[in-house]
Regions:
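C-terminal outer-membrane/trafficking sorting elements
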Residues: 135, 177, 199, 240, ...
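Extracellular/luminal low-complexity Ser/Thr/Pro-rich, glycosylation-prone repeat/linker regions
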Residues: 404-423, 515-574, 586, 616, ...
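Short beta-strand elements of extracellular/lumenal beta-sandwich folds
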Residues: 434-459, 572-601, 669
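Short, acidic Ser/Thr/Gly-rich low-complexity loop/linker segments typical of extracellular
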Residues: 339-350, 357-378
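A short, solvent-exposed beta-strand micro-motif common in secreted/extracellular proteins
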Residues: 281-283, 373, 381-395
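Residue-level detector of functionally pivotal "anchor" positions at catalytic/ligand-binding pockets or at interdomain
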Residues: 320-332, 347, 422-442, 557-561, ...
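N-terminal capping/linker segments that flank leucine-rich repeat
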Residues: 5-91, 271-276, 287-329
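Low-complexity, intrinsically disordered segments enriched in Ser/Thr together with acidic residues
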Residues: 494-522, 633-661
Length: 773
């Protein structure tokens, strides 16, 4: 061996290095990284002042660090020339010295090398195919090529002056820390799935691809990143990317994330809906942040953070996706109508807009099945029960292949069941509702949608009638050719309306101008009436066979609104009955609205949440109801800019314990994609007794016919003192006095519509609602 004299003495050591080897403890015998302080820590075992080959080859762990544990080591190494003689060393620690170069290529057994906190500008580790751990942080290296280090698992090279770092194809590499250098690029090509930890912060890196890896920690702060994608980081726990140029950041797939700091970027959108509440979250100093997508459970906390950052115009919701963040399971429910009452099969009818409840033993959620007959719930782990809730449950029998489900974990599992709804007896029941598709403006066209549905068990055929005041409204067209068209009226014959089926007809009328005769002006009321009847049979629920709509004429309007179709004032006799609401929305922006969400927080003290039904919508809608929050999701609606419109028609019962002068209100927030929500009007309806003392009702009063054309007959078992006529707004229109038990009221001067008659007799009063045709 070169440099070996008699007795195999090694002679090529740097003098300072030899001094350390001979006079100080440098040997670690128990593999704790610290030189032993007793005689076993001395390499010169025979104490002859020399290092023999046998002594060098006996060493497995060599500790030369300044803080090696020896109380006497005060000498700082400037060279380790001769280090190649330690051919069996697997662990070398020479940190915190003044080495400017280090060549350990002749130490083939080396597995761990710690040479941080020196002044290295050169490091040769070529050929070290057993090296697993390398730390040369806090040096002056400008480049490093790790090619060939095929077993390397950990590389620490932070706080150098690196402009080039080659780590490609290190298939065993698990952790890389190269922060605080001068890198402009970092190529991770060829690293494998074992790569878990990366710290490359405080560089000038402009692009970084970590998509192939499932990291547990990622620190890339203080770089020049404008894009960073994290589609596969399901085990990422710590993530810091502050002080970059990121405009959007999506950690939706990071379902184990505990720490996220993305402060001081150029973010306009942030997606943190991942099913977990981060322990530490920061996104300050992103003044252009307009949208944050979060889990519902995090909504309040993230909103508070945004407020503290001064982000008053930042929309925060969960509507970047319509499945839960993180892990979840899915229950699919198919609903079919057994028209022949012989068991559901492939020939039976898939139903839509059937209310479905999900119960986990404590809480209940609701959805309505879609057009293909399917409904779905997203769940965590646990036991769940799914139940169809029909408007008329006594009409039908319901059976299911299964309605209870168990999931051991929220891990992407799914289960499917089928519900079969069959007739329970013979029931004839249809309904009609009129929906304004536009406002009524003087001189412009107005569109009205007639929505009719078979709620019974039998196929229905019959007639749908539509009437209006032809003095102020002119018929223009209808989406379905009428069977009869007369002045102020149109009718359509319908056949084979299936149970649960809904159909619509749109009718267009033109409103008189302010200069026409008679004139129509802002604030006028237009009265329109729709009625439906089944041929040859009696409808079991005639109250919903007629719908009167009183529309106020306007000159201007808000296209995003909620309207109660029954009006702003109703008699107390309507308490506990259905109210119909239409929510209109319009895309007034400059780009397509891909998704639209209507969020309605319903007052449970005023409304019966269990009665809510979806009747009709302008496009396919996914409904979910949790507690008193109803969300109507129009996914992929692609609503065109500059006037693309949509709507949903609902009905819900008011609580039966409401009294005179109580009000019910509805409003909604409308979310167009990632924009700040638009808040609609607060639509308020007041229940009023129209001055009647309900403790003094005269139940003998009878009013007929109803509906009425011109004259209405009124009778009672007591003398009728007066009859007062009120319109739907509660205004007194007409008074008739008398003293007999029978009287005739002439309504020929009143327009078509709904009126209230307050009839006062010797024994009390009564209010009756009538419809004038």
């Amino acid at each position: 061996m070169s440099g070996i004299a008699k007795a195999q003495i090694i002679t090529n050591f740097d003098p300072g290095f030899k001094n350390i080897l001979v006079n100080y403890v440098t040997v670690d015998t128990n593999n704790d990284g610290i030189a032993e302080t007793d005689y076993t820590g001395y390499m010169d075992t025979n104490r002859d002042g020399e290092i023999q080959v046998s002594e060098a080859q006996a060493v497995k762990s060599l500790v030369l660090g300044y803080f090696s544990g020896s109380p006497h080591m005060s000498y700082v190494l400037q060279s380790v020339a001769g280090i190649e003689n330690f051919t069996n060393v697997t662990y070398l620690d020479c940190h915190y010295n003044k080495l400017t170069s280090l060549d350990v290529s002749g130490m083939p057994q080396l597995q761990t090398l710690k040479c941080s906190e020196n002044k290295l500008t050169s490091l040769n580790v070529s050929g070290l195919t057993n090296l697993k751990y390398l730390d040369f942080s806090y040096n002056d290296m400008t480049s490093f090529d790790a090619t060939g280090l095929t077993t390397l698992t950990t590389l620490k090279c932070f706080n150098n002056q690196l402009t080039t770092l080659v780590v490609e194809n290190l298939t065993k590499l698990e952790a890389l820390d190269c922060h605080s250098n001068s890198l402009t690029a970092l190529n991770l090509t060829g690293l494998s799935g074992v790569f878990k930890k990366l710290d490359c912060g405080f560089n000038s890196i402009a692009s970084l691809d970590v998509t192939p890896f499932d990291l547990t920690s990622l620190h890339c702060a203080f770089n020049q990143l404008s894009v960073l994608e994290l589609p596969n980081q399901r085990n990422l726990q710590l993530f810091e990317c502050y002080n970059n140029n990121l405009t959007t950041l999506d950690v939706s797939n990071c379902i184990a994330l505990q720490r996220l700091h993305c402060n001081n970027n150029a973010l306009t959108s942030l997606f943190i809906k991942n099913g977990i509440a981060e322990i530490s979250l920061g996104f300050s100093s992103n003044p252009n942040l307009a949208f944050v997508c979060v889990d519902d459970a995090e909504m309040n906390a993230v909103q508070a953070l945004a407020t503290s950052y001064g982000l008053t115009a930042c929309a925060i919701n969960s509507y970047c996706s319509f499945v839960p963040g993180g892990g979840y399971n899915t229950i699919y429910g198919l609903v079919n109508f057994d028209k022949n009452n012989d068991g559901c099969d492939a020939n039976d009818i898939p139903l839509k807009n059937i209310r479905m409840n999900l119960n986990d033993g404590t809480n209940t959620g609701t959805t309505f099945n879609a057009v293909n007959g399917g409904a779905f719930f997203y769940t965590n782990a646990g036991d769940f029960t799914v139940t169809p809730v029909l408007e008329n449950p006594s009409y039908f029998n319901v059976s299911a292949t299964a309605n209870t489900f168990n999931f051991a974990a929220a891990s992407g599992l799914s289960q499917t069941t089928s519900f079969c709804i069959a007739p329970n007896g013979t029931h004839h029941d249809v309904e009609v509702v009129m929906v304004p598709m536009t406002v009524a403006r003087p001189g412009f066209e107005a569109v009205y949608r007639l929505v009719y549905k078979n709620k019974g068990t039998q196929v229905a055929s019959g007639t749908l009638n539509f009437s209006y005041d032809e003095a102020v409204l002119d018929y223009v067209s209808a989406s379905l050719t009428s069977n009869a068209l007369t002045s102020g009226a149109a009718s359509w014959n319908f056949i084979n309306l299936l149970p649960f089926e809904t159909r619509v007809i749109d009718v267009t009328l033109r409103v008189n101008t302010p200069t026409a005769s008679p004139a129509v002006n802002d604030g006028d009321i237009l009265v329109l009436n729709a009625a439906i009847a089944i041929n040859g049979v009696t409808d079991e629920m005639q109250a919903d066979n007629q719908f009167v709509y009183n529309q106020k004429v306007v000159n201007s309007y808000d296209p995003n609104e909620v309207e109660c179709l029954e009006g702003e004032k109703l008699p107390t006799s309507k308490v506990g009955e259905y109210l119909h609401y239409v929510i209109h929305f319009e895309n007034t922006g400059t780009a397509d609205a891909i998704n639209v969400v209507l969020k309605d927080v319903i007052d449970e003290a005023k409304f019966d949440m269990g009665s809510l039904q979806v009747i009709e919508s302008s496009a396919s809608v996914y409904t979910r109801i949790n507690n008193n929050v109803a969300e109507f999701i129009f996914q992929n609606i692609n609503l065109k800019p500059g006037g693309g419109r949509g709507h949903i028609l609902l009905k819900v019962k008011s609580k039966s314990n409401l009294v005179s002068d109580d009000t019910v209100s509805q409003k909604a927030n409308i979310y167009f994609d990632y924009n700040f929500p638009i808040e609609t009007n607060n639509e308020t309806t007041t229940f009023s007794a129209l001055g009647v003392n309900e403790n003094e009702l005269d139940q003998t009063v009878k009013v007929y016919p109803n509906p009425v054309v011109n004259e209405v007959q009124i009778s009672a078992q007591n003398n009728i003192r007066s009859v007062q006529v009120y319109d739907i707004q509660g205004r007194l229109l007409q008074v008739q006095t008398g003293g007999e038990m029978n009287t005739v009221l002439d309504l020929s001067t009143q327009n078509q519509g709904v009126y209230f008659l307050k009839i006062s007799t010797d024994s009390g009063s009564k209010v009756e609602r009538i419809i004038k045709q």
